[in-house]
Amino acid sequence: MNKEPMSMHGYNKICAELKQLKEVERPNIVKEIDIARGHGDLKENAEYHAAKEKQRFIEARIVDLSEIVANAQVIDPSVLAHNKVSFGSTIKILNLDNDKEFSYTIVGSVESDPAKGLISFGSPIAKSLIGKSKGDAVSIQLPNGESDFEILDIYYKEICFDEN
C-alpha cells in the first residue's frame, strides 16, 4: 500500500479510534456474544447473530485502521513552502466558466470534509492542482464535466478540523 499523507491531527484521530475499538468495543462485543450465547439455540438467536455481525464490523475496522496507521506519512504543512500547491496548502481558485471563486485546503483522505473545503490529497481536484503555481490555468474533471480554473492564491493557514 502507498503511504497515506495526513496531518498529526488526522493521525491522532485514527489512533484514538483504533485504541477505542481494541480496548473498549472489542471486549464489549465479546461480552455481548457470551450473553447472547446463553439465550439458547444459536440458529434462531437474533441477538447472537447481531452481536457476531457487529464483531465482524469491529474487526474489519481494526484491520483497516491498523493498515492506515502502518502506512501513515505524517506531514506538518506549516513547515512546507506553499509557493506551489502541496499537502496542507489552501488554494483559492476561480472557475473561468462561471467566474465563481472556491477555496480548498488539501488534507489526507481520513481528514477530508468537502463541505468544509477540506479535500483529499488523492481527490481529482487536488491531483489536478498539486505542483501548480499561482496564476496557472488548470482543467479539472468534475462530475458534470471538465471546467477550467485559474489559481488565484496559494497559502498556508492553520487547518481547522472542528469535530462538530
Curated annotation (Swiss-Prot):
Keywords: DNA-binding, Transcription, Transcription regulation. It comes from the Bacteria. GO terms for molecular function: DNA binding; RNA polymerase binding. InterPro entries: GreA/GreB_C_sf, TF_GreA/GreB_CS, Tscrpt_elong_fac_GreA, Tscrpt_elong_fac_GreA/B, Tscrpt_elong_fac_GreA/B_C, Tscrpt_elong_fac_GreA/B_fam, Tscrpt_elong_fac_GreA/B_N, Tscrpt_elong_fac_GreA/B_N_sf. GO terms for biological process: DNA-templated transcription elongation; regulation of DNA-templated transcription elongation. Disulfide bonds: none annotated. Belongs to the GreA/GreB family. HAMAP family: GreA_GreB. Necessary for efficient RNA polymerase transcription elongation past template-encoded arresting sites. The arresting sites in DNA have the property of trapping a certain fraction of elongating RNA polymerases that pass through, resulting in locked ternary complexes. Cleavage of the nascent transcript by cleavage factors such as GreA or GreB allows the resumption of elongation from the new 3'terminus. GreA releases sequences of 2 to 3 nucleotides. This is Transcription elongation factor GreA. It comes from Helicobacter pylori (strain G27).
